[in-house]
Amino acid sequence: MVKISVSRFGSKHNPHYRIVVTDVRRKRDGAYIEKIGYYDPRKTTPDWLKVDVERARYWLSVGAQPTDTARRLLRQAGVFRQEAREGA
């Protein structure tokens, strides 16, 4: 099974996260299939959250399950907005 999750990188006391598509059997910071975005929790830049919405929707359409944190970030990026309108 494939999941969409966050993978930590950056330095000590300065976390940054990649939003990645990975196999559920991989470690949090292990190898991933595709990087679809990034997140800066300290909001040090104007683009503190960036997600490739098209690729995120693709992976969701083929069955990737987002983790709770990834789901929250994808929702903030607007990944679920268009899907809700199309289904209505």
Swiss-Prot record:
Gene Ontology CC annotation, any one: cytoplasm
Keywords: Ribonucleoprotein, Ribosomal protein
Gene3D superfamilies to which the protein is assigned, alphabetical: 3.30.1320.10
Database matches in Pfam families: Ribosomal_S16
Disulfide bonds: none
Gene Ontology molecular functions: structural constituent of ribosome
Record family assignment: Belongs to the bacterial ribosomal protein bS16 family.
HAMAP family named among the record's database cross-references: Ribosomal_bS16
Name the record gives this protein: Small ribosomal subunit protein bS16
Gene from which the chain derives: rpsP
